[in-house]
Amino acid sequence: MEMLTKFESRSSRAKGVAFHPTQPWILTSLHNGRIQLWDYRMGTLLDRFDGHDGPVRGIAFHPTQPLFVSGGDDYKVNVWNYKSRKLLFSLCGHMDYVRVCTFHHEYPWILSCSDDQTIRIWNWQSRNCIAILTGHSHYVMCAAFHPSEDLIVSASLDQTVRVWDISGLRMKNAAPVSMSLEDQLAQAHNSISNDLFGSTDAIVKFVLEGHDRGVNWCAFHPTLPLILSAGDDRLVKLWRMTASKAWEVDTCRGHFNNVSCCLFHPHQELILSASEDKTIRVWDLNRRTAVQTFRRDNDRFWFITVHPKLNLFAAAHDSGVMVFKLERERPAHALNINTLLYVNKEKSIVSYDLLRAQSTTVASVKHLGSAWLPPRSLSYNPAEKVALLTSSADNGVYELVNVSSRSNSLPLKDNIKGPGDDAIFVARNRFAVFSRSDQTIEIKDLSNKVTKTIQLPEKTRDIFFAGMGHVLLSTATQVHLFDLQQKKIVSSFNANRVKYVVWSNDNSQAALLGKHYVYIVKKNLELITSIHETIRIKSAVWVENNVLLYATLDHLKYALMSGDTGVIKTLESTLYLVKAKGNMVFALNRAAEPVSFEIDPTEYLFKLALLRKDYEQVLHLIQNSNLVGQAIIAYLQKKGYPEIALQFVEDPSTRFELALECGNLETALELARTIDRPEVWSRLASDAMSYGNHKIAEITFQKLRYFEKLSFLYLITGNAEKLQKMAIIAEKRNDTLSLFQNSLYLNEVESRINILEQAGMYPIAYLTAKSNGLEEKAQQILSHCNKTEEEIKLPSLGSAFTTPVPVNETYTHNWPLLDTSHSTFEKSLQERMEQLAIERQEEQESEEEYEEVEQSLMDVVDEMSDLAESVPEEEVDGWEVEDLAPEEAVNDVVDDASAFVGADEIFLWKRNSPLAADHIAAGDFESAMKILNKQVGAINFSPLKTRFLEIYTASRVYLPTISGLDPLVSYVRRNAETAERSQALPFITRNLASIKSHELHEAYRLVKANKILEAQICFRSIIYLALTTVANSEEEADEISALIDECCRYIVALSCELERRRLGEEDTKRALELSYYFASADLQPMHSIIALRLAINASHKLKNYKSASFLGNKLLQLAESGPAAEAANRAITLGDRNPHDAFEIEYDPHVEMRICPKTLTPVYSGDDFDVCSVCGAVYHKGYVNEVCTVCDVGGIGQKGTGRRFFA
């Protein structure tokens, strides 16, 4: 038996201590008059209470209420509320020191005893004294309620122990009952008698005499009819009582000074006593012999108490308080696959099947060590079916037990014993025995013969298993991996006082458990991560090689190899984990009983999937688990996954911050409209400009009415039309400065002059007119000012002020960004979230509402309304129907290459590449057109003009020189890493990744928003960009070609939808055919779902149930759940009930077909047809050499060598 100290405080002399029934708190009453509240787990002082004058002796918590009572030398019994930290009231009545005070376990009573030779019972609710027990002739040192009966025991310096019967008091204070007249008269008579001769509410039942000197303490046994007493005669006496008598059983002798306090062990047949001889002694209740003595050098013990529920004791002494327990409560156990071997409280080895929940006793180890000390550890050898147990009794002993037979619980005769502090198996037929005193390890065989003795190189505290032929040596500051064959340390790791080691399933990692830390290391003791806890760590178990579950006193937690930790659940009691599999955890409790419970592993599985970059698992957990909470959101932000955190948040402000963090400006815009606060719009404007998204920046500036910033934005993006509107707005606002600024941006000279005249700034107006050659206007200003030209001395005037003319309509595009490589998870997540958005939209709209939306979207998009008015809900995105050329055309730079410095490089560009884009960059537009005509049969190049100029401009950098000289030209290469000029190739702006992340994303968005015309224009622009793009590999070239084919499919499909909307109710049969053609197109899943649902709705209206059923089956393949799946199932059900079509239409779903863009009719695989080599559109015969209506570039039926994007 050993004293395991859990907490110790340092203070002045402590006279009393009390455990809280549920919280890890103790109250200590000090001799200096102060009361302290401690958290004994954390070792922290929580509060102090001052209210007594003089020493405080009695202290006790209430069992259920937030109250405690204290009694001191100021004769007061104080009742406190520890939550409000206030003294509620004082109970006055005692005439001398109050020694003990305590609460009744059931009634609102407080029991107190005093040096005034009385015992008082108080009702703390009514704050009255309800009984005074007199009879002792000296100080009453102790009084206590019986745990279950209506009895009180008291001890006094009059050398007696008295037992009081308070059943009368209980009946008197019980709930009132109806009584007859006779009972009422009898009660009145008794009341008169009590006034004359004293109360009979509490009467002395027994007077126990046996002590030779004063009695300091007495206590009832929790369950047996026993009483314990201790006194100044240095004896601890045991008494037994019955209903009619009480007598002394025996005396425990051994203390050599006054015994201050004593108690019964609540769970074992032991007695504990505390004495002024500076010892705490443990006695055998049955034999009344001393079991163990715990001594302090300088502190006398004054009080000892036990926790009402846990196996903890607290003792008050001269230097403070200590909390301790007498034995380790961790059951010795070992796991072999699904079989758990453990030692129960009866010291028998039990084999427990975790899957079947069946237990079998296989051996007994009652004779191992001391009767009061359970085995400390168990090591199991599954090959030989033997177990090795160790105990700390007798300076360390081990026992080798055969557990293969299913015999009775009697000890086996062939058990082998020997001295040793630790013993573990290190091979199939070898085990190691560690001696702490000798610092040696003996290797023994199963017959207990020593085969090898190893002297350890370091002072070792414990040894642990570390694989066959290896052990871990735990020292005070380090852990060593020790090779038993080579007798040397292989590797070391700095860790203080490692208590337990838990190996992973494949023995590749280990968790080193200390008192407050966990170190996770590799097999060679290389650190992976470390975890620190403020509460003691009790056990750990591996779920798999990357997840560790560990238990503290209060919680079950997890740890990942990245160092991430979290709480899985709160534990009602301390558990020792033995195995975890899936969502089941198996453990042993402190009663050495196996328990199992379910956990929710979603949180650590989610984090583990992120750690492994298993995005499919992450997506699955998001869709099927209830992952919520600020902790998950903060974790995702910390780990750099704001786009995932965005899916968990509902609060608009938090979603807005996350959207900005992950660069999702479209979502941020929607949220800004919801929040609608100036600071939010300002944040969005700043981020939009940082990302080069001038379209969203324009919306934010409109919302904030930043007119100057809007004007400048339109200037740098070349949007002259909106600059003109800004000038009109400035005029309406009477903002002269803004109007002048916009006239500068627009280069409107006459407007500037008029503004300056209106402002009375005639000199500047005159200079402006003269410098821009407006002589007539200059003369008008002079005449208005009564001046002549001779009177004015003009400075030398420079050239007229002009604004640059934009080469490209840059306001139609946002600034291009580098495309990040989207993971499988991000793509799946984006597609899934867009699908959910479509489904929610379809849930909210009825068919009639959807038709109204369709009708409204058939019209051409109106021009932007006056910017001074409120901003519309959504800006018109996409390409304009007509491309307006700038007022001043850009001069074509197709001069003779020999006239330029560096013309050799341009020649090399054309020589090194057969691609049209490289010839465009060289300035040889004619050669590029010939290449496109030869490769893809292009015949109409006017739509490519803007793209040609863009490529040409982006391949050069012009450096201005001194006035009068032409600028220096520097050519930009895409293979700048190549040193040889002979292999130079020009830089081609806009690659595949850029097109996908901007134009293609925008086109998808327009389709989703039901903006059909804009979407067609956007897809057509993608064809122009892709046709003159250069690939970095053959694979990328194939992707570009596939992108052109996809754009062609979208344009033809959207043409069918536009034609159907134009027809309306004129030709319902033709409209139904067009809806089928739209639904049969190979589109993205989210767009195909919309098309199929529209076609199903149209089929139901015209009673084509058979065709609707076929479309329903296709829809069900794309949408397995949600409203779309419900609509598909309804269509299939109606088709099964009525498998007929009311209209015969030109549509065969079982034959492969393409749609002719000219006639919007099917072209089946067996028909004659012509193809556009540019976009791949298929036409009926009869349109050869006409311009393709899909791409507007290629010639129908023109032959070419094929698309080429990689050289």
Curated annotation (Swiss-Prot):
Phosphoserine, modified sites: 409, 942
InterPro entries: Beta-prop_COPA/B_2nd, Coatomer_alpha_WD-assoc_reg, Coatomer_asu, Coatomer_asu_C, Coatomer_complex_subunit, G-protein_beta_WD-40_rep, TPR_COPA_B, WD40/YVTN_repeat-like_dom_sf
GO BP, sorted A to Z: endoplasmic reticulum to Golgi vesicle-mediated transport; intra-Golgi vesicle-mediated transport; intracellular protein transport; retrograde vesicle-mediated transport, Golgi to endoplasmic reticulum
GO molecular function, one term: structural molecule activity
Keyword Protein transport: yes
GO cellular component: COPI vesicle coat; cytoplasm; Golgi apparatus; Golgi membrane
Keywords: Cytoplasm, ER-Golgi transport, Golgi apparatus, Membrane, Phosphoprotein, Protein transport, Repeat, Transport, WD repeat
Domain of life the protein comes from: Eukaryota
CDD domains tied to this protein: Coatomer_WDAD_alpha, WD40
SUPFAM superfamilies (UniProt xref): DPP6 N-terminal domain-like (SSF82171), WD40 repeat-like (SSF50978)
Predominant subcellular localization, coarse grouping: cytoplasm
Intervals holding WD repeats: 9-50, 51-90, 93-134, 135-174, 210-249, 254-293, 296-336, 370-411
Function comment: The coatomer is a cytosolic protein complex that binds to dilysine motifs and reversibly associates with Golgi non-clathrin-coated vesicles, which further mediate biosynthetic protein transport from the ER, via the Golgi up to the trans Golgi network. Coatomer complex is required for budding from Golgi membranes, and is essential for the retrograde Golgi-to-ER transport of dilysine-tagged proteins.
The protein's name: Putative coatomer subunit alpha
